[in-house]
Amino acid sequence: MADAPLQGARAVVTGGGSGIGLAVARRLQALGAELVLLGRDAAKLGRAQRELGAADAIACDVGDAGDVARAFAKLHERPLHVLVNNAGVARSAKLVDTTDQVWDEMLRVNLSGVFHCARAALPLLVAAPFGRIVSVASTAGLIGYPHVAAYCAAKHGVVGLTRALALEYARTSVTVNAVCPGYVDTPMTQETIGALAHATRRDRTEARAMLERRNPQRRLVAADEVADAVAWLCLPASQSITGQAISVSGGEVM
């Protein structure tokens, strides 16, 4: 394959069945990587696997430590070079209306999920010629937003974990980075638009425009733009880039 810097590398993408995760999977495959998709939704995983052809797929809830351990136990026969932590969920509510269940879900999936997968993957990544961990955080991991305190707390945690792991593994071939998108044109953002429209009694077009106005470019970020940033950090040539939280937000966060 021409221009395939990830030829022979194997990459795990969590939440790889749709949205940013699927865009990342496509991009890594185009660069030559062999894919393993993890996700909770078997139907989405199946559709992604059929589209991508050669990809493996494992049903896995990243928020469940046992589930993650079982999934990664299937990967020990061959080297692993890349882990992309993309699986995530978002719920919105004022803090006083945030239930314990919502708080726990936000931390369990968005933060503990990254911890579980990184812990399981690191022995394999260290043993490979090069290793990459890239976590899809959010601009909510860099600044605060109203009505998503639990989500912000989790994503700030992802950025902190990224920086700590980058230092912990600085003397190995493993780099650890985060990509922090603004609002991305994905099914999850469409759910956010619907919730915003309901909460503000606006139609969906007006609600979408509210999100677009947060971006100085006055648009939603494309999933492929996030995927390109992730893919760049996964390259063997990106060895000197570690501990970074890179905003992909049209200038919303600088």
Language model regions located:
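Substrate-binding pocket helix/loop in short-chain dehydrogenase/reductase
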Residues: 94-95, 102-107, 211
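Active-site helix of classical SDR
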Residues: 118, 154, 162
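Short, small/polar-rich loop/turn modules that mediate ligand/substrate recognition or access, typified
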Residues: 170, 175, 241-243
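C-terminal substrate-recognition "lid" of short-chain dehydrogenase/reductases
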Residues: 115, 217-248, 253
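Alpha-helical segment proximal to the catalytic Tyr-Lys
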Residues: 123, 167-168, 239
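Conserved glycine-rich cofactor-binding loop
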Residues: 17-18
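Residue(s) in the substrate-gating loop at a strand-loop-helix junction
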Residues: 138
